[in-house]
Amino acid sequence: MKTYIIHYTKLEDRKNNILSFLSNTDCDYEFITDYDKEEIEGNKYYFADEEKFNDKIKNLWDSRIHRFRIINPAEISCTIKHILAIEKIAHQKENIGLILEDDAIPIENNFVDKIQQLIDTAPDNWDSIFMGAGCGIDFMNQKLRESRLINERFAQVKHPSTNCAEAYLLKKESAKRIYDSIIPFQLVSDWELAYQFYKLDMNVYWAIPPLFYQGSKSGEYDSTLR
């Protein structure tokens, strides 16, 4: 299973940390480095369209709170990199790909074995499995109360079904469908993914407990998206 790492090239400490835990595994990995925020001018991926933005928001979130905005260069860059990773999964030989953001930190050293255990025991109909702690335990608990517990490892989550996007699995066929639908995007990465999952009626599961946490949420890194 190939791993694609969303990486802003100026954050060398994040790259070094990712390499420190991947180097102890037999993972095949690739850093997604094109379209840093300084390189997004004239890109084909993002189009600021107020009508489309509002159409996406109203289906899943409170449009009275989440008003139209032009997302910032760092957010555009991050979202493009996710799309590039999704494209690579859509065209790879293997049936499953893993996407990590460069601030993802494994909770346990044997995370590769844990991921394989998830894949081996997941419901057959999954399109994506989110494995990160994302917004934190309070958000997870609230969302899980509204979700369908499959077993002690999985919950099938209602839309919007993302929890940040620091660590998630995608099936190849699901990646193809997302890639064919997502360009041009209007929302930041995890929200745009949430909309695409909803639009394409995909089955999204959360791993219980999560296998990764987000260094920019825990305070180990400064967030670079704002």
Residues covered by each model-derived region:
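An acidic/histidine-cluster motif and surrounding catalytic segment
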Residues: 1-100, 104-226
